[in-house]
Amino acid sequence: MKYLLVILFFFISSFQNNSEVIIDKKEAQDAFALLIDIRNNPDKYHEELNFEKGLKVSKIKLKWNDTLAKIAESKAYDMANRNYMGHVDPDGYGMNYYIKKSGFKLHPKWTTEKSANYFESLAANTYSGVESINVLVTDKDVPSLGHRKHLLGLDSWNAALTDIGIGFSKRESGSTYKTYTCVIIAKHDY
């Protein structure tokens, strides 16, 4: 009987481990490295990522920000854990709220609406952080190309952003998607 209980325990435990949310920092760093390379060499990627050659990408060097990375990791974890995909969490809060809550300085008017998001791009169900960046830069079926503009700094707002953090989470079961990626690009003391 004792052996049967042990076997039953391990059998049940094996299913529970598959629903654990895992933060993968290596995938986040790989995504960051690719984004930097795309921004530095856009013509190298224009065919693969479906944008015109000679695209005027922001020349501002993005700096990894540990605070933004922790927020991005928390968001990727939360989406996997609570099984949603969106810029506003189930409690109605957007990314600007969480950035301000972390101590990262934002203009006060950017946090008056609790669902506001000026700094976040999201991807889901990609096999890697690199694929997440590819999907977001391609921005297929997004007429405004908002993710591309955000990640590559293609307009005056996004071109001024300097700090970046990326979170990549995995969950084998228990959520709609197996992976969630959150990319935050902002500017400290804006």
Over which residues does each language-model region extend?
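Sec-dependent N-terminal signal peptides
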Residues: Y3-S13
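Hydrophobic, Leu/Ile/Phe/Ala-enriched alpha-helical segments that form helix-helix packing faces
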Residues: L8-F9, R39, L151
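Signal peptide cleavage region of secreted peptide precursors
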Residues: F15-S19
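Short, well-ordered surface patches within globular domains
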Residues: E20-L106, A160-D163, S169
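A well-ordered secondary-structure block
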Residues: G94-Y190
